[in-house]
Design a protein with these regions (language model features):
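Terminal amphipathic helices with adjacent charged low-complexity linkers/tails
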Residues: 151, 159, 225-228, 387-417
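Adenosine-phosphate binding glycine-rich loop
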Residues: 166, 186, 296-408, 431, ...
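N-terminal ligand-binding/catalytic initiation module
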Residues: 1-163, 397, 424-442
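Rossmann-like adenosine-cofactor binding region
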Residues: 247-320, 325-327
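Solvent-exposed alpha-helices and their adjacent loops that cap or buttress functional pockets
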Residues: 62-68, 104-105, 130-132, 156-157, ...
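Glycine-rich phosphate/diphosphate-binding loop of Rossmann-like nucleotide-binding domains
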Residues: 82, 89-107, 165, 173-272, ...
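General beta-strand structural signal in soluble alpha/beta enzymes
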Residues: 113, 139-142, 163-166, 223, ...
Length: 443
């Protein structure tokens, strides 16, 4: 049987070969007919001046007269790329191209990679703010913590388009979706559930705030990391007030029983553990799981290797186990979230996205599983109906929250999203059939 290390090595070799062959995963093509050079006179100068004049009178006309309505900027500084760490903007580009490809294939969204060479959070905010006119929304990606919290917060406050950090919000959203169905299976209520968030990086900090918005009891939520259980008396609490105020606020609001000491103490009597910690089996010990309540729910989300293998977790008493991997049941995958969420905010021409809309998104995703069981708590990526349904739920939520520039019924938004996604897939199929996209070479 092939080892995980060998499988990863083989995939890396194939990725390098294919990347050299295709030289990029996305491209830009005209979407208008060009029958002769005379057509340039209205697609470009002099006719285009009338279009610019119209937008100058009302900048929202850019959504009607240009591609802004369907354009997303994927912005990164390359400081926390996958499991690679700080590799810089150039080395982040293949990852951002892959993200853009998924945006387009699953959501019909035109996403543009925008790696930027910046060194501090204030410069990042300035550069992103300056680029706002080109895009209908932003997806922030692979930014180190705690810089990512500052950048997201500042851009959400200052910009007039939705700003999303997928490492935070996408992970939190699909985690909540999985927990909704897991709690149904074990017959527990969210307001009664005791939750441990193991790891206090971008994903779990955002998950804590989303669980609060969803109605979980923050006093029954405990955060633990490499320094032990987070509480107001921990030795680093004063410094957190200045270096990571988002984590500091959680230290004050969570852990009603004031558990302290080693992380293992947080597991005792817990109903749920969501781990986004070190990618190393054994990071979570089997005996920690055995101290949890009956019908325990364990999400071990580190990639490429979970913090505890699913079999070990189940043998130790867990009833439901989820990971970030596709070769185990219950993959908690951001790709179930961001294509549909962005399709929705773009269709509504939204000005912002918030935790309430994320709760709506999580409920829409969980609702795709009509009869959840221990091995099926979230949909799979080949559930094609997921994305337009999620988009319509998000778009209509933007309308009800007063964030939308465009107001339609939920059914109309479903029709809009379905048409865009289906049209995009037909265009992609036509490129394949015509040979415009070359067949995949032998691996």
């Amino acid at each position: 049987m092939i080892s995980d290390e060998q499988r990863t090595s083989d995939l890396g070799r194939i990725a390098l070969k294919f990347s050299e062959y295709y030289r990029g995963k996305i491209r830009v093509l005209p979407k208008v007919p060009i029958n002769s050079l005379k057509d340039f006179s209205y697609w470009y100068t002099p006719g285009v001046a009338a279009v610019s004049t119209s937008i100058n009178k009302n900048t929202d006309e850019a959504y009607n007269l240009t591609g802004k309505w369907n354009s997303v900027g994927i912005i990164t500084d390359g400081t926390r790329v996958l499991g690679l760490g700080n590799v810089g903007p150039e080395a982040s580009l293949p990852v951002m191209e892959g993200k853009a490809m998924i945006f387009n294939y699953l959501g019909g969204v035109n996403a543009i990679p925008v790696p930027i060479r910046v060194t501090d959070k204030d410069t990042f905010v300035k550069v992103a703010s300056a680029l706002e006119p080109s895009f209908g929304a932003y997806n922030l990606e692979d930014i180190e913590s705690p810089k990512c919290f500052f950048v997201l917060e500042e851009l959400q406050k200052s910009m007039n388009i939705p700003v999303w950090h997928d490492d935070q919000l996408g992970t939190a959203c699909i985690t909540l979706a999985g927990l909704i169905n897991s709690l149904k299976i074990v017959g527990k209520k969210k307001e009664d559930a005791s939750v441990v968030l193991f790891g206090s990086g971008a994903a779990n900090i955002a998950t804590a705030y989303l669980l609060e918005a969803a109605g979980f009891d923050m006093k029954k939520l405990v955060i633990a990391d490499s320094k032990g259980v987070l509480n107001p008396d921990r030795s680093d609490i004063d410094s957190l007030m200045f270096t990571n105020p988002w984590k500091y606020r959680l230290a004050m609001a969570t852990n009603g029983e004031r558990i302290s000491g080693e992380s293992s103490k947080a597991f005792k009597g817990a109903d749920i553990v969501v781990s986004a910690a070190k990618s190393e089996p054994g990071t979570i010990h089997r005996d920690w799981i055995s101290t949890m309540n009956k019908d325990a729910i364990v999400f071990a989300l580190a990639n490429p290797s979970p913090e505890i293998w699913p079999g070990d977790a189940k043998e130790s008493g867990a009833r439901i186990v989820a990971t970030g991997r596709s070769d185990f049941p219950n993959q908690i995958n951001n790709s179930l979230v961001f294509p549909g969420v962005f399709r929705g905010v773009l269709d509504a021409r939204a000005r912002k996205v918030d935790f309430d809309i994320m709760v709506t998104a999580a409920e829409s995703i969980s609702g795709r599983i009509k009869e959840p069981d221990e091995d099926h708590i979230v949909p799979s990526m080949d559930d094609w109906h997921l994305y337009p349904e999620l988009a319509s739920a998000v778009a209509y939520s933007c309308v009800t929250k007063g964030y939308a520039r465009r107001s339609e019924s939920k059914n109309k938004f479903l029709e809009i999203a379905t048409d865009i996604i289906e049209e995009n897939r037909k265009a992609y199929a036509a490129l394949l059939d015509s040979g415009s996209i070359k067949p995949t070479p032998e691996a």
